[in-house]
């Protein structure tokens, strides 16, 4: 019996000796990727709170610059024709001006491009909230076969072959391999600088300038806040010291009903599988809303007037319609004032967020 045990033990030893060694990543948890440069402050403009920043991705000048370059670079798509900015461009309030976005090889998305402007304040990203952070959001479109049609590995391989990019990654994160985690963190750092406030509303509401808004916009603000009128602030929130104009929650308005009266897009339900979330979509911010037509998650409303008229009608009735969506009793003047107020939410666009890959035309004297 002892001899048999010895042979078994010897066999186990030989088996273990022949087995492949565990990968380094399996032996030791991978060290977190973190920028190495000096942390910079992202200053929030009038009307907005401090910008939320994750502990593992503090903003640095190097990561912001790298993220800005990546954001505008078509290298992140399979045929190099689509960049992040293709669907989220400053000329359209960091959307794209289309009902649904164009993808690679003639593909079409199924939803309106969410605005990137002030997305730093969203607790969940995408219309359905499937990404918990800007970093995770930056992972999605690249690998979507319709949007950018690439793989994370393919992006990394392409960037490794670019000596300029490799040097910029090393400068931002320290010497080491280029990874998609670094790509996502750089893009997210840049997007946290894409914030806009100091609008006529902000100067009126928080800056003490009572002449900053027109009389029509001031009347529209009252319609916006009044629960018996627009009741808009119920979801598009205004706080004492700042205004995000979003409750960061999900609501069913009945947008996107098909000819059979069915919801064509299940929205938040696809993530939660909770019946109450059927057809519910994230409340978008209204900041710079005048710049980002068309509207709603499917881009079905071309103008702010169409949006207001939709709410006046009480949305589209369905089993899961949000309890706060009710027909509004607004006069034509109140409707027009409400639109004028929303136009007063157009804020100051910060410098340094346009395409760094495009050389500015020389100014002729």
Q: Where do the protein language model's features map onto the residues?
A:
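Bacterial N-terminal signal peptides that target proteins for export
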Residues: 1-8
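Low-complexity, intrinsically disordered segments with a bias for serine/threonine
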Residues: 10-13
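C-terminal motif of bacterial Sec signal peptides marking the signal peptidase cleavage site
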Residues: 16-17
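Short, conserved catalytic or interaction motifs in soluble domains
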Residues: 20-21
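Short glycine/threonine-rich turn/loop motifs
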Residues: 28-140, 202-302, 306-312, 316-319, ...
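Generic hydrophobic/packing signal
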Residues: 120-123, 138-142, 159, 163, ...
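A gly/proline- and charged-residue-enriched helix-loop-helix capping module
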Residues: 145-149
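C-terminal capping alpha-helices of c-type cytochrome domains
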Residues: 152-197, 290, 300-365
């Amino acid at each position: 019996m002892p001899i048999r045990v010895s042979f078994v033990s010897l066999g186990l030893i030989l088996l273990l000796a022949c087995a492949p060694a565990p990968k380094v990543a399996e032996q030791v948890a991978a060290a977190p990727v973190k920028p190495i440069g000096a942390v910079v402050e992202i200053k929030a403009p009038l009307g907005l709170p401090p910008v939320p920043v994750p502990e593992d991705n503090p903003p640095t000048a190097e990561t912001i610059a790298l993220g800005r370059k990546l954001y505008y670079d078509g290298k992140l798509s399979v045929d190099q024709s689509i960049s992040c900015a293709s669907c989220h461009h400053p000329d359209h309030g960091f959307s794209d001006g289309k009902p649904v976005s164009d993808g690679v090889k003639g593909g079409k998305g199924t939803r309106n491009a969410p605005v990137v402007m002030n997305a730093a304040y969203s607790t969940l990203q995408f219309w359905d909230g499937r990404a918990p952070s800007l970093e995770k959001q930056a992972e999605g479109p690249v690998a979507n076969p319709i949007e950018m049609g690439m793989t994370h590995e393919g992006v990394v391989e392409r960037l490794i072959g670019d000596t300029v990019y490799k040097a910029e990654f090393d400068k931002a994160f320290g010497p080491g391999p280029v990874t998609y985690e670094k790509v996502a963190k750089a893009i997210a750092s840049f997007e946290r600088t894409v914030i806009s406030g100091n609008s006529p509303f902000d100067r009126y509401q928080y800056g003490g300038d009572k002449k900053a808004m027109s009389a029509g916009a001031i009347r529209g603000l009252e319609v916006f806040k009044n629960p018996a009128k627009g009741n808009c602030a119920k979801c598009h929130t205004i706080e004492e010291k700042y205004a995000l104009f979003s409750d960061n929650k999900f609501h069913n308005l009945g947008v996107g009903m098909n000819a059979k009266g069915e919801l064509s897009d299940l929205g938040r339900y696809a993530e939660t599988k909770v019946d109450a979330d059927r057809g519910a979509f994230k409340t978008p911010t209204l900041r710079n809303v005048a710049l980002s037509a068309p509207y709603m998650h499917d881009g079905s409303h071309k103008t702010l007037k169409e949006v207001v008229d939709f709410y006046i009608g009480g949305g589209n009735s369905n089993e899961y319609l949000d309890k706060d969506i009710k027909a509004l009793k607004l006069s034509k003047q109140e409707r027009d004032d409400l639109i004028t107020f929303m136009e007063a939410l157009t804020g100051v666009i910060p410098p340094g967020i346009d395409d760094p890959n495009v050389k500015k035309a020389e100014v002729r004297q």
